[in-house]
């Protein structure tokens, strides 16, 4: 399987970059890399883990919470997001969904 570099940028501007396989959820890979991210349901059914992707593509088809207008703005649920390219994602974006 392919491996991509994912860079997460936190609310204070802190950056963490790590590798994620294309069949691994970004949240799971972040935890393995020691990055502490917010989450709740781990099933794409809430918005606790929401981030905003500024570069790259993900597959988050297993999620159910986000609507098309969220996708158009780049919102991503890290608990159900598989990377499809190298990505840059701003984390902790739940409050901006509403």
UniProtKB/Swiss-Prot annotation:
Pfam families attached to this UniProt entry: Fer2
Any one Gene Ontology BP term: electron transport chain
Gene Ontology MF terms: 2 iron, 2 sulfur cluster binding; electron transfer activity; metal ion binding
Location of the 2Fe-2S ferredoxin-type domain: 4-95
Binding-site residues for [2Fe-2S] cluster, renumbered to this chain: 41, 46, 49, 79
Metal-binding found in the keyword field: yes
GO cellular component, one term: chloroplast
Record text on cofactor binding: Binds 1 [2Fe-2S] cluster.
Keywords: 2Fe-2S, Chloroplast, Electron transport, Iron, Iron-sulfur, Metal-binding, Plastid, Transport
Cofactor dependence: [2Fe-2S] cluster
Subcellular location field: Plastid, Chloroplast
Family classification: Belongs to the 2Fe2S plant-type ferredoxin family.
NCBIfam families found in the cross-reference section: fdx_plant
Function: Ferredoxins are iron-sulfur proteins that transfer electrons in a wide variety of metabolic reactions.
Note: In radish there are 4 ferredoxins: 2 are root-specific (R-B1 and R-B2), one is present in both leaves and roots (L-A), and there is a minor form which is leaf specific (L-B).
Protein name, per record: Ferredoxin, root R-B2
Organism: Raphanus sativus (Radish)
